[in-house]
Amino acid sequence: MGRIIGIDLGTTNSCVAVMENGSPKVIENAEGARTTPSIVAYAEDGEILVGAPAKRQAVTNPKNTIFAVKRLIGRRFEEKEVQKDIGLMPYKIVKADNGDAWVEVRDKKMAAQQVSAEILRKMKKTAEDYLGEEVTEAVITVPAYFNDSQRQATKDAGRIAGLEVKRIINEPTAAALAFGMDKKEGDRKIAVYDLGGGTFDISIIEIAEMDGEHQFEVLSTNGDTFLGGEDFDQRLIDYIAEEFKKEQGVDLKKDVLALQRLKEAAEKAKIELSSGQQTEVNLPYITADASGPKHLAVKITRAKFESLVEELITRTIEPCKLALKDAGLTTSQIDDVILVGGQTRMPKVMDAVKDFFGKEPRRDVNPDEAVAVGAAIQGGVLQGEVKDVLLLDVTPLSLGIETLGGVMTKLIPKNTTIPTKASQVFSTADDNQSAVTVHVLQGEREMASGNKSLGQFNLSDIPPAPRGMPQIEVTFDIDANGILHVSAKDKATGKENKIRIQASSGLSEEEIQRMVKDAEANAAEDHKAFELAGARNAADAMIHSVKKSLAEYGDKVSADEKATIESALKEAEDAVREGDKETIETKTNALATASHKLAEQMYQAEQAKAQPAGETGNQSTGPGNDDVVDAEFEEVKDK
């Protein structure tokens, strides 16, 4: 059985960890960083860049560089949150045939799951490079307030990336695992305040010792899946663009290249204002008009930034109140407050949390890594490596069906511990009704139209009977991933229809399989490109070496041999420019063979040079001197 890795698939950054010798370890990526920007770029030559390389080229390729795609995953194009993003993103958000929000890059429509899969593939490769073995299983985290469609879409992204997603767990719950695993302080109630790049969650969790077992029980959860650091950045972008417009009369928002530069500068300024009281955004040659180039220089104080985002911070407090109310607790009953997500580094956010809960948040949890660490611990639990840990999570939103009059009848209330199962008997609305449509909903509104539709299915061939007589038993079953399975059964005939809820949107099995094949083809292409680069490097090294030797020792070989070497050199150079891996390797080997005589001459010349030097000192190199001196050496270990 392979290793189960833990992945925090974030809006802005992602992170991967694994259990090693009983402890979770965050793995550094190929660039040497512990977190990877959740950015995917599609280059003109078909190459797909992920992470830091994608971020570096974003300014010159804004329309084909996708960031914050987590805000679109599992969402319908018509949703107001998606419509809001359409006007803000430099890349194109389009409506898919199934009504989902997809992106368009280089005239190709792509699902958010496909883009997310590229990030997951990078995380998978990071783990494989570190472990030295193939990784096929993972625990992936999602915001606690993600609905069923978003959870299912995240699981699909894992499949496209070549991962079997063993468990989907909520980000605050994962952070609680990371925090509480080594704490032996008895029963504690903690609040996990998770303000990430694109989502906000608050979870109230009880950590208890039960018969020697560490039990993590989520008492309640709440949040906003469209509130995060990206929104804080946007407030800063809007302000800087407005100031520039006042001063120069040019609207930077109409220029995608300028906007991308502005986004990078705003993100940097936001980070600087967490430690400093003032910063300056300097962007020379940001744009130009008839009068010539324009330069941007705007000073921003911490107080100004705080006033710009005050409303966003206030928006996080209402879910905190609701979560406490649902848990039946007051702020004084919370023992610890944990901050998760990069945006919680902002002093004003820390102050708001401190003011609400009446206590200093803990500083001993890394806000960028805690979620991945918790996911790795859950992977260890599933693998049997981590023992005596029980995780009891909840469903964040109520689940039910549409009944007569367009009302939502709830079968499973929000904050119910999962996995769980609930059944209720319904009947027909008309005489002799032969079929019923079960319309599955998720949300807290009383009317069906105000809630998220998760899908629907029919139960047909109901025997004719007066209305209200047939007994249709509807059963909801939520698995440990928080994903819903629904069945409807006619109790009179025993006829049953069941489905795993796949939203009226979502990807079909055929689409997922096609995307898996695309991803595999990309991986194969990547490997071929990697091997080609290796062959070119080896050839370049050989060409350089032979050219150098030819310049120094060319007069020591015959004219024919020199001509053969020069011919082999030219063929090798041509192969490097235009050839495939096999051609390059063949021509490199031919060059090595052709230059063999030259190498011999070079070796003899080096020996001749070394001989006089050997004769002037101790004659240890001469024949007949068999004395061997044993040298003592001390190994110096790195401190």
From Swiss-Prot:
InterPro entries, alphabetized: ATPase_NBD, Chaperone_DnaK, Heat_shock_70_CS, HSP70_C_sf, HSP70_peptide-bd_sf, Hsp_70_fam
Induction (free text): By stress conditions e.g. heat shock.
Keyword field: ATP-binding, Chaperone, Nucleotide-binding, Phosphoprotein, Stress response
Keyword Nucleus part of the UniProt annotation: no
Region (Disordered): 600-639
Record-linked Gene3D superfamilies: 1.20.1270.10, 3.30.420.40, Actin, Chain A, domain 4 (3.90.640.10), Substrate Binding Domain Of DNAk, Chain A, domain 1 (2.60.34.10)
Presence of the UniProt keyword Lipid biosynthesis in the record: no
Annotated PROSITE patterns: HSP70_1, HSP70_2, HSP70_3
Modified sites of kind Phosphothreonine: T199
One GO MF term attached to the UniProt entry: ATP-dependent protein folding chaperone
Stored SUPFAM superfamilies: Actin-like ATPase domain, Heat shock protein 70kD (HSP70), C-terminal subdomain, Heat shock protein 70kD (HSP70), peptide-binding domain
Segments crossing the lipid bilayer: none
NCBIfam families, per database record: PRK00290.1, PRK05183.1, prok_dnaK
Homology family: Belongs to the heat shock protein 70 family.
Function: Acts as a chaperone.
Name of the protein this chain belongs to: Chaperone protein DnaK
Species this protein is from: Thiobacillus denitrificans (strain ATCC 25259 / T1)
